[in-house]
UniProtKB/Swiss-Prot annotation:
It comes from Bacillus subtilis (strain 168). The gene is pcrB. Pathway: Membrane lipid metabolism; glycerophospholipid metabolism. It comes from the Bacteria. PANTHER family: HEPTAPRENYLGLYCERYL PHOSPHATE SYNTHASE, PTHR40029. The keyword Lyase does not apply. This is Heptaprenylglyceryl phosphate synthase.
Length: 228
């Protein structure tokens, strides 16, 4: 079974966006620790299955980050289920977990399911709107949510700025209070220099939008983070 505490870099692919097969092959063989499939809108069973079938041709771990229960399909190595700690809607805090367990609990191994303590810190992003997150947060708010993740013993605390570069001081202070939760950071990582800078404080760097904006620059983040 895969151990997320050993990861340093992951790519996040949106099943609602197209990526040429040649680029997908390069990405999957880049040395990244995993490929996460997930998005905020337009996520369907069909496009998730299509993306998974392409990624599964390679050895890289393939993860589904669940944002729609109806889009859960078998065949992934891991299933990340986000608990959006700063959501105003209980469905996004624990409701989705209950629904997933009710629908698929008897079919899935508990070793394949990983709960993420999500903290969305960009109030203008699609993820904040989808999850009804109170995302206008200051540094103390973010650190407090990280402490909640520790309290709940969540294996992952995901600090999500979704498309914009977050406050690196917030990342530093968040990391300082986490002892058991692995810190995933996502948002605005578009080049090797920025990836390396944020990797000094986060356990795992998530590169998503950059894959579609400038593939070659996004690819260089792997070596920058992993020191290869």
């Amino acid at each position: 079974m895969y151990d997320v505490t050993e990861w340093k870099h992951v790519f996040k692919l949106d099943p609602n966006k197209d990526l040429p097969d040649e680029q997908l092959e390069i990405l999957c063989e880049s040395g990244t620790d995993a490929v996460i499939i997930g998005g905020s809108d337009g996520v369907t069973e069909d496009n998730v299955l299509r993306m998974m079938s392409k990624v599964r041709r390679f050895l890289v771990p393939c993860v589904l980050e669940v944002s729609a229960i109806e889009a859960i399909v078998p065949g992934f190595d891991l299933y990340f289920i986000p608990s959006v700690l700063n959501s105003k809607n209980a469905d996004w805090i624990v409701g989705m977990h209950q629904k997933a367990m009710k629908e698929y609990g008897e079919l899935m191994s508990m070793e394949e399911i990983v709960a993420e303590g999500y903290c969305i810190a960009n109030p203008d992003c699609k993820a904040a709107a989808l999850t009804e997150a109170d995302a206008d947060l200051n540094m103390d708010d973010i650190v407090a949510y990280a402490r909640v993740s520790e309290l709940l013993q969540l294996p992952i605390f995901y600090l999500e700025y979704s498309g914009v570069l977050g406050d690196i001081e917030a990342v530093k202070k968040t990391k300082a209070v986490l002892e058991t939760s692995t810190l995933f950071y996502g948002g605005g990582i578009k080049d090797a220099e920025t990836a390396k800078q944020y990797a000094e404080h986060a356990d795992v760097i998530v590169v998503g939008n950059a894959v579609y904006e400038d593939f070659d620059r996004a690819l260089k983040t792997v070596a920058a983070v992993k020191g290869e």
